[in-house]
């Protein structure tokens, strides 16, 4: 009987295979038979190259458009579509063979033909792009999916195809790949860029790519998120390619050996560093929804070699191989429905939970075997090359002429799907050699040529990678690049520091304490500029009126950019960092914060400086910095600089003229001025001219005003409803700056900014009080003034991007009120609107204190990311609540300090205190309150919630928020970032921090109970609130019995109970969880030792 069943199965399989083959009738190629037979040992170099030339001619160049030079995506008749990405690899394939032909003296014109096929394609793409120069200009200012360059063009005319609504054109990886191959090909001697219009256009492409770290796109697979619902994501593969392109093109001359100073491309060093940080924080993930992805292979290996860290490279590669490798190729990503038998070809997007259908039957792509072969060649690993060559051979096919063909993918036919799902890997797959995909997959064909040329040693890695994107570890020290793609070597970087005093009298005063400084006049002819003037200079970079392109967008220059020396219009210029700018936002008035910022900036430079030559850090000392009690901390910092070590960073202080010789010099030659053009005006930092016979006085002010001077005489609630004339009278009578500001704020809301008081308009009056309060360090009045005039720090948007770069979400809004979740970078204007809209209805001062915290957290998360471990969502309002709670704990029986009266540096220290791992001395109530406010979770928490959900058919509910089992488990995977965010969203409805922490503990208890009792599962919806209530009820019973006290509804004693121990919270939580589980059915298990029969 078994034999008959096996025979029937075999016959059935043959029938199904024949049916699948019938569907593929009309194929021009069949499985490979003779193409890989060993060729004669005495084959000449000409014979070897001639063989590959014929392959390239018949499987690549045959399809190249004679007009634009682009390559079609599908080679079946009549298809007019060309994808930038595919065409680039086709050009690279022709170029690779041209490099091999350079080794033959008499090549019969083939080198020229192949090189110019590549050039024609590269210029064809440039032609398509330049016709969309208006989109480059829009995207540069406002990067959105509806302002980007197109990724699809007509193969023969170069016209754009499909609107933004019909196709996801935002694929930054394609633009980055173009820039990368442009540099590689020009470095090999090809001439691709012809004139200054093209140079300025490429420079503008660089401006677009620089900010990839903050632009979610549709990725290599053109689908955005894994759910294929039209949403974009930040992809590691896109960021990695952008990083590689920026490293390759920085300081590169687009005219090659014939170039001059104005054909050089400039890259913002700080933007490049942001991309690097983003890539390292995203990996080994591809994005929030893609836990891993085969698109990472060309990112971490050929052609980008984007990773600095060998450990991260191995971790990422291992994950890709482990999760995606198959017999026929690599899956693109898990649950990828592309071209599977169950995908509906008529629908562009998937329905919710539809991706579960594709689990286990994803198509496998042989092209990734080729990437692994190339990676093996570059890394000198012949074993890897052979392994993937052996895997590739059985899946190759051949044309009727006998040339090898790489199928685009292998799929499971519809008749085999159920068998494959039941037994993964058991069914035969069939290649995509007909139908919608055309006859040849040109991207695969091109990569096959590159891989085989490298494997057969007809070209070397140095030939195809002339800019040395890949540098072996042992050779890293010998590579002279603008900044290498390789990570920092273990060196002891010394930062050069120049001390500049703003006036001569300040210099004399500091000299009496042994601090040697220079004034702006003493460093002449070197000019000192604020970074904003450098931004003005860079605005002239890439301007092209004919194409309608402006220069570099108005983006600040960061610490790395200001650590270089610039040659501008014959002048030598140094810039002081942005932290020394006199900002309109009040934080710049706190000297202790400035000292902290200087230490952070030096640590940042030490960690991320990658250029040859030492960084030059200019410390600008102002007279206001040393007044009163601010003098001692400032003097301590200057003494530490003089001694050569500050904050763990080695520094060398010297005269600016001496330090220039060891610095990096950037020539800004794009500022070419003709006789007819007017010279741009730049304002250098000018020396302060003090009044005659004046001296610097240390005693002129104090660091913080006395508490009594800070305390207002009036309250908003008391005076809000009083008539205007009474408010004006009180305004004239009181001398307290905080009280005056509060009264003016009431008038501002009621009468408007132009209402006249005795000292002018309300808005002008508030502005003057704001300045006076700042000089006196009356922080309460300062914050009121800043809030009423809606001050906004220019560094908020970059700091929020820093949160996102580190894989965190951020919420803005007051504790206990509606919050706005930010999961993608936003413009400063949008963030300002959110802050003032969400916070002003609660307390005017909240809007400015939230800005302070965003700035503080941005610095802390950059330098000490471990303080935010376990915190996926940073809720600013809740953190403020935690800080106020901490002040209450510290005050004991006395009235707590007002958070708004603390200086910004004291606020930062308080923030650092609550972020530190909780000290043992704290009671459990305080621990839970702080951890709950910080939204901190234990290690592996979200994975445990996933495991709970797997055994909870009706889902989990807490605070009225339901997390259903389906479609959650169908749409997502266990280690997916989006699932973790979904859990956070569920917990976000809880309004009490300590209660939230008890719920987190409860979920950990549920997970452990289920783990130890595999036969149990929940039959009904798990109501966490109900379980906590029952656990508290059990706790009350024990408390009243043991302590002989009446039951109390107040849960304080429960919150203050340790989790572990005989009567710990976990024992009560475990009891109610077990009760709920035992109410349901017990699933029998064969391994259960308790079974009696």
From Swiss-Prot:
Regulation acting on activity, per entry: By phosphorylation of various serine residues.
Modified residues (Phosphoserine): 12, 27, 701
Maturation and modification: Cys-1090 is farnesylated, but the C-terminal tripeptide is not removed and the cysteine carboxyl is not methylated.
Region listing for Calmodulin-binding, in residue ranges: 7-29, 768-795, 920-951
Protein's pathway: Glycan biosynthesis; glycogen metabolism
Name used for this protein in its record: Phosphorylase b kinase regulatory subunit beta
InterPro entries in alphabetical order: 6-hairpin_glycosidase_sf, GH15-like, KPBA/B_C, PHK_A/B_su
Region described as Disordered: 688-716
């Amino acid at each position: 009987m078994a034999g008959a069943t096996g025979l029937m199965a075999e016959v059935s399989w043959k029938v199904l295979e024949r049916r699948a083959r019938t569907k593929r009738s009309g194929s021009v190629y069949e499985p490979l038979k003779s193409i890989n037979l060993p060729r004669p040992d005495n084959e000449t170099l000409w014979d070897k190259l001639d063989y590959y030339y014929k392959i390239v001619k018949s499987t690549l160049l045959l399809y190249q458009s004679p007009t634009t030079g682009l390559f079609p995506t599908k080679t079946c008749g009549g298809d007019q579509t060309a994808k930038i990405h595919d065409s680039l690899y086709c050009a690279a394939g022709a170029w690779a063979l041209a490099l091999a032909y350079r080794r033959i003296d008499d090549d019969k014109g083939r080198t020229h033909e192949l090189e110019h096929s590549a050039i024609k394609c590269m210029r064809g793409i440039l032609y398509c792009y330049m016709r969309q120069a208006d989109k480059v200009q829009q995207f540069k200012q406002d990067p959105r999916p509806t302002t980007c360059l197109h990724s699809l063009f007509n193969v023969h005319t170069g016209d754009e195809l499909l609107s933004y609504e019909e196709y996801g054109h935002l694929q930054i990886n394609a633009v980055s790949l173009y820039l990368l191959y442009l540099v590689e090909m020009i470095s090999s001697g090809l001439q691709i860029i012809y004139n200054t219009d093209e140079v300025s256009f490429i420079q503008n492409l660089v401006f677009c790519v620089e900010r990839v770290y903050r632009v979610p796109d549709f990725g290599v697979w053109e689908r955005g998120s894994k759910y294929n619902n039209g949403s974009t994501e930040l992809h590691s593969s896109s960021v990695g390619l952008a990083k590689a392109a920026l490293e390759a093109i920085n300081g590169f001359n687009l005219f090659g050996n014939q170039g001059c100073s104005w054909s050089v491309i400039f890259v913002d060093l700080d933007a490049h560093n942001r991309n690097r940080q983003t890539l390292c924080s995203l990996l080994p993930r591809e994005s929030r929804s893609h836990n891993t992805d085969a698109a990472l292979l060309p990112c971490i290996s050929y052609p980008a070699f984007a990773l600095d860290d060998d450990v991260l490279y191995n971790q990422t590669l291992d994950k890709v191989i482990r999760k995606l490798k198959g017999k026929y190729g690599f899956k693109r990503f898990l649950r990828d429905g592309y071209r599977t038998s169950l995908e509906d070809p008529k629908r562009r997007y998937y329905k919710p939970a539809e991706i579960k259908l594709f689990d286990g039957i994803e198509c496998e792509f042989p092209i990734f075997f080729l990437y692994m072969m190339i990676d093996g060649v570059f890394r000198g690993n012949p074993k890897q090359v052979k392994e993937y060559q052996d895997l590739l051979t059985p899946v190759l096919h051949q044309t009727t002429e006998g040339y090898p063909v790489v199928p685009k993918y292998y799929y499971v036919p519809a008749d085999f799907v159920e068998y494959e799902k039941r037994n993964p890997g058991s069914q035969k797959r069939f290649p995509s050699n007909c139908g919608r995909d055309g006859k040849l997959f040109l991207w695969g064909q091109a990569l096959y040529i590159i891989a085989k040329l490298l494997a057969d040693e007809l070209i070397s890695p140095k030939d195809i990678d002339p800019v040395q994107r890949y540098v072996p570890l042992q050779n890293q020290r010998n590579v002279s690049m603008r900044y290498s793609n390789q990570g920092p070597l273990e060196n002891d970087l010394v930062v050069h520091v120049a001390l500049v005093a703003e006036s001569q009298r300040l210099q004399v005063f500091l000299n009496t304490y042994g601090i040697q400084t220079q004034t702006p006049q003493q460093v002449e002819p070197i000019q000192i500029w604020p970074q904003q003037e450098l931004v003005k200079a860079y605005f002239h970079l890439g301007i092209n009126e004919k194409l309608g392109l402006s220069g570099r967008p108005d983006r600040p220059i960061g610490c790395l950019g200001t650590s270089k020396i610039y040659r501008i219009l014959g002048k030598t210029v140094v810039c002081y960092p942005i932290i020394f700018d006199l900002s309109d936002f009040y934080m710049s008035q706190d000297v202790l914060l400035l000292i902290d910022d200087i230490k952070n900036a030096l640590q940042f430079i030490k960690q991320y400086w990658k250029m040859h030559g030492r960084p030059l850090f200019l410390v600008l000392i102002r007279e206001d910095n040393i007044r009163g009690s601010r003098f001692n901390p400032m003097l301590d910092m200057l003494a530490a600089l003089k001694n050569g070590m500050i904050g763990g960073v080695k520094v060398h202080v010297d005269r600016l003229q001496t330090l220039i010789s060891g610095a990096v010099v950037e020539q800004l030659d794009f500022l070419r001025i003709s006789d007819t053009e007017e010279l741009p005006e730049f304002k250098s930092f000018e020396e302060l001219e003090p009044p005659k016979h004046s001296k610097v006085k240390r005693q002129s002010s104090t660091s913080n005003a006395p508490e009594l001077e800070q305390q207002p005489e009036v309250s908003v609630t008391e005076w809000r409803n009083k008539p205007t004339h009474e408010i004006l009278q009180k305004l004239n009578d009181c001398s307290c700056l905080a009280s005056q500001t509060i009264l003016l704020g009431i008038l501002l809301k009621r009468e408007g900014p132009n209402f006249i008081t005795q000292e002018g308009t309300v808005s002008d009056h508030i502005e003057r009080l704001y300045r006076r309060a700042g000089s006196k360090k009356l922080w309460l009045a300062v914050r009121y003034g800043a809030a009423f005039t809606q001050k906004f720090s220019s560094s908020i948007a970059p700091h929020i991007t820093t949160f996102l770069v580190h894989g965190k979400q951020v919420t803005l809004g007051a504790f206990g009120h509606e919050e706005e979740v930010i999961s993608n970078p936003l413009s400063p204007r949008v963030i300002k609107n959110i802050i003032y809209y969400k916070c002003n209805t609660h307390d005017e001062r909240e809007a400015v204190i939230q800005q302070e915290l965003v700035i503080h957290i941005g610095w802390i998360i950059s330098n000490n990311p471990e303080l935010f471990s376990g915190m996926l969502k940073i809720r600013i309002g809740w953190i403020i609540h935690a800080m106020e709670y901490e002040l209450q704990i510290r005050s004991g029986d006395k009235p707590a300090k007002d958070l708004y009266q603390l200086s910004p540096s004291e606020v930062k220290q308080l923030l650092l205190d609550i972020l530190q791992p909780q000290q043992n001395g704290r009671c459990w109530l305080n621990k839970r309150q702080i951890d709950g406010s910080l939204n901190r979770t234990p290690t592996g928490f979200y994975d445990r919630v996933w495991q709970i959900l797997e055994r909870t058919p009706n889902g989990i509910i807490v605070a009225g928020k339901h997390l259903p089992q389906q479609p959650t488990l169908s749409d997502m995977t266990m280690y997916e970032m989006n699932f973790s965010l979904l859990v956070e969203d569920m917990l976000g409805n809880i309004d009490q921090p300590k209660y939230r922490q008890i719920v987190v503990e409860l979920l950990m208890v549920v997970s452990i109970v289920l783990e130890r009792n595999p036969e149990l599962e929940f039959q009904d919806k798990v109501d966490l609130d109900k379980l906590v209530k029952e656990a508290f009820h059990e706790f009350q019973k024990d408390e009243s019995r043991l302590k002989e006290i009446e039951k109390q509804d107040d849960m304080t004693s429960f919150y203050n109970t340790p989790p572990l121990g005989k009567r710990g919270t976990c024992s009560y939580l475990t009891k109610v969880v077990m009760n709920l589980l035992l109410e349901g059915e017990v699933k029998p298990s064969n391994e259960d030792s308790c079974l009696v029969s």
